[in-house]
Amino acid sequence: KNEDKMMNLTELLHEKQNIDKLEDIIQQICQEVEPVNQEASKDFAEKLDTLVPPQQGLGKLRHMVMQYLSIAGIPAKLMPPVNFIFCSDHGVSAENVSAYPPETTLHMATNYVISKGAAANAFSNFVQGKMKVADLGINGNTDNLPDIDHVKIRPGTRNAAQEPAMTRQEAATSLLYGIQQAMELKEQGYTILLPGEMGISNTTSSAAIAAAICQVSPEKTTGRGTNISDQRLQKKLAVVKQMLATNQPDATDGLDVLTKVGGYELGAIAGLIIGAAHSHCLVILDGFNTAAAALIATTICPQAREYIMASHIGGEAGHPIALQKLGLQPIMKLDIKLGEAIGSSLAADLLINGLAACLNVLKSDVEKFAYVDRVQDIMIQPKSVQLTDKTFDFYTKTMPP
């Protein structure tokens, strides 16, 4: 079923398609997303609570493991996660809202696949992840870069402070690419996806997305991004307000919000989330930009929310607002400002080791009963303590007058 869909999506991505057809396919995929299987983890949870008292004593770790099992089931072999970095430039960078020049996006993409010396590479190696990099809209030539998906919908979005960031067809194309990638990765056996992004000025786009969908003022969603100055922060806030006033995105239409104020890499991450939900994969969000993409994904496909986990709360002002709208509790508070699947790598490592430990607890019935017996021996006394008139003699005799 997924193989047929992947072939169709591949054809669509290489042909000029009518926007209505693209939207019909996205809608069909969303309709096929199933609720997570709570029964798949229920029996596991009951046994775990028996073996590791008190009930739910493992806290967030237990919740992480149960969410994964309800999505993917108990794995015969747990594959490593996929660290997927989506790259694109943003036309709004012309408004001077970032501390870095736009060509930084190309330089970082080159670093990912040539010298492999970025934080994204280091954390992917740490979690033993499969690393993928995609050019959705870098304003520069990446044809000679190895190990990169050359998608390039356009060399950067348009300046959303002046006009819509992209056409609706371009927005749908970015979504479909992400959907296709999630389906393809599931066919290869991967079930934990860690989206990251690189795109100078993309926190400006994310601030506009969060303000639009969460229905809050831009003051609450606009942060310092790459640690910009107070003066530039005020400029950035004014630009976010201008983006929203110019384009008037419809908060109920995720594709419209993406079209008006989004980015190609954010659309691809939103698509990855929808495709993961369709394919029963877990997506662990990283920072604010991935949360903004999740807002788009869940506006288009509300049932995809059950397939998302929030790794951490970062340093951007809009991050907690986006997570609250998504109904997600972050696992950690890290104040990370990089968006290269760093926080999500740490969460994935915690999940994978937690899952392995929980499976190990249940591995042997002999060990299980021995453990329960030991706990009962410690916690249940053979008889209650008997108090006599001698019980407090030591204390009364040694007390100072």
Regions found by a protein language model. Give the residues of each.
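Short, Lys/Arg-enriched N-terminal segments with co-localized hydrophobic residues
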Residues: 1-6
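N-terminal loops that bind phosphate or other acidic moieties
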Residues: 7-400
